[in-house]
């Protein structure tokens, strides 16, 4: 969970709509992570080169393999570093936007016909239902806070947007 916990639960009002914008909790910037991976790769390459210099020629290919694994891990982390989900509550609609990896999903529900399921939240995402259409929210909120978030969203849906 990112940012201020109360803002993540209570939501933010921008004058015309309520919204909840939650992001993945990452404590290190991509630039710092790139530096760490580069240093680890250089150390591994240095160790492999020293062993190669002394005649142990099979260590260097494994060092290169290790660097490739580090590169794959860095790319995976970079793809998911900007994951987020956003729920926007306007006067007539509920918009849910979720970016996971390279995939962007958007769902729009009619506010007057949408219900928030607050009963079955034990270790599950918040379920917003409009008839047979389902949408989920709360992936980046701690499990213990999801019920409070669901209650807050439900309360904001009942009250009119000023």
What are these regions (language model features)?
Residues 1-53:
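N-terminal membrane-targeting/pre-transmembrane regions
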Residues 63-90:
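Helix-adjacent hinge/juxtasegments
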Residues 19, 95, 125-127, 136:
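General beta-strand recognition
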Residues 94-96, 106-121:
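Phosphoinositide-dependent membrane-docking surfaces
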Residues 81-107:
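Membrane-cytosol interface motif
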Residues 53-66:
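Hydrophobic alpha-helical transmembrane segments
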Residues 128-162:
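A membrane-cytosol interface segment of integral membrane proteins
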């Amino acid at each position: 969970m990112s940012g201020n916990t109360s803002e993540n639960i209570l939501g933010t009002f921008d004058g015309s709509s309520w919204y909840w914008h939650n992001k993945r909790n990452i404590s290190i910037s991509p630039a710092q992570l790139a530096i760490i991976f580069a240093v680890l790769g250089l150390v591994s390459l240095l160790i492999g080169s020293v062993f190669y210099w002394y005649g142990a020629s099979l260590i260097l290919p494994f060092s290169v393999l290790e660097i490739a694994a580090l590169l794959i891990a860095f790319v995976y982390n970079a793809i998911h570093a900007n994951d987020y989900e956003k729920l926007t509550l306007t006067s007539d609609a509920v918009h849910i936007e979720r970016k996971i990896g390279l995939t962007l999903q958007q769902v729009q529900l009619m506010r007057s016909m949408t219900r928030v399921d607050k009963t079955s939240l034990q270790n599950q995402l918040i379920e917003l239902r409009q008839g047979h259409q389902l949408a989920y929210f709360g992936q980046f909120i701690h499990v213990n806070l999801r019920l409070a978030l669901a209650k807050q969203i439900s309360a904001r849906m009942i009250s009119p947007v000023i």
